[in-house]
Amino acid sequence: MAEPDRLVRVGAVDCGTNSIRLLVADIDRATGALTDVLRRMEIVRLGYGVDRTGRIDPDAMRRTLAMSREYAGQCASLGAEGVRFAATSASRDAANAAEFVAGVRDAFARFGTVPEVITGDE
């Protein structure tokens, strides 16, 4: 077992077209070894209707941002020092993607998280 001061607790959120996943883990600074503390996955259907309308559906955005706030609270209560948030297709392609990104920034403001909207290749 690593010495406690060698560990850093972090969170990572993967927000896709249909689900949003959370990983909170301890990383050993010396070895890079990762130990899961919490894993969650919820279906939010963020991409519902985006192909048809070109926009994130208001209910889908509300569901996803509510789960983002819940995940941020869990990261805080578990002592995460930072959180990385990566979002994919729906948040990249939608006309109202900026509204979604602003909501995520607000949800994770205590961590200074800037959501990363990754390319299709990433």
For each feature predicted by the language model, list its residue ranges.
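Nucleotide/phosphate-binding catalytic cleft detector across ATP-hydrolyzing
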Residues: 1-15, 23-122
